[in-house]
Amino acid sequence: MKNITVILPIHDLKGEYNEMFSRAILSVEQFHDDVSLLLVGPKNVLGDLKKDSISDKLDVNIVINEGDTGFCSQVNLGIDNCETEWFSILEIDDEYTPNWIKSFRTYHTLFPDADILLPIVKDVNSEGKLLNFTNESVWAYGFSENQGELSNEILLDYQNYQTSGGFYKTEVIKENGSFKDNIKLTFSYEFLLRLTHNGAKVATIPQVGYRHVNFREDSLFWSYKNSDDHKLGDGEAKFWLETAKKEFFFKNKREVEYVDN
């Protein structure tokens, strides 16, 4: 029985996005015996798509989003509609590596109580050039009291952890809340802080399982750094970091607003 759902949020399928979508589907098809695919997006993008035209290998479900189509809201809607024991988040311009499932099976045996398992993420630029790796620090000698485990205490000091590509127990996330779409920049950081604060066990997999395109032009985090409409200054970036450290005590989002002094 397939017990993992891959949630793929989509806001556009024109031009280069269609090429990204095709690569993302091929990435998931490697694991067609183990996973199902859940697409989330607006009706004008996904409304005319036929399941059998997407993949002849995967079990595909489509959820039409009639509300906010921002990344957090799309993922949250996918989680609400997830019925498997586990889920993972795949960004449209990213890919899983061939050992993604195998390494999960191996390290879930090592960490049987884990509610979340995060693979090492290979960060590349839009040309595919290696930039760095993420999520690997927890295996450094002496970094964590329990090697391989990511605690709330560690997260309060270290913020750079990637949530896409990881494995999440659906029941635990539904119980503790998903992404808060009103938090800019640090929404995934607040998410991990909240989960670990509430007792969720997070372990990391010391193998590369996910390839992430970092700061692709027009991506959300690119816009925070470069867009005239969404660019964040140093003061606002610091504000959202501190906000994450205050808001993780609360399951539901509260009103938060940055005021430029």
Stretches found by the model and what they are:
Residues E83-T84, Q162-N176:
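Conserved nucleotide-sugar donor-binding
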Residues F87:
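Short aromatic/hydrophobic "clamp" motif used to bind/position activated sugar donors
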Residues R23-V35:
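Short, acidic, metal-binding catalytic loop of nucleotide-sugar glycosyltransferases
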Residues E136-Y158:
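Short, flexible, basic/aromatic active-site loop/helix in glycosyltransferases
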Residues I101-F133:
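Conserved donor NDP-sugar-binding/catalytic core segment of glycosyltransferases
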Residues N65-C82:
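Glycine-rich, basic loop-to-helix element that forms the pyrophosphate-binding segment
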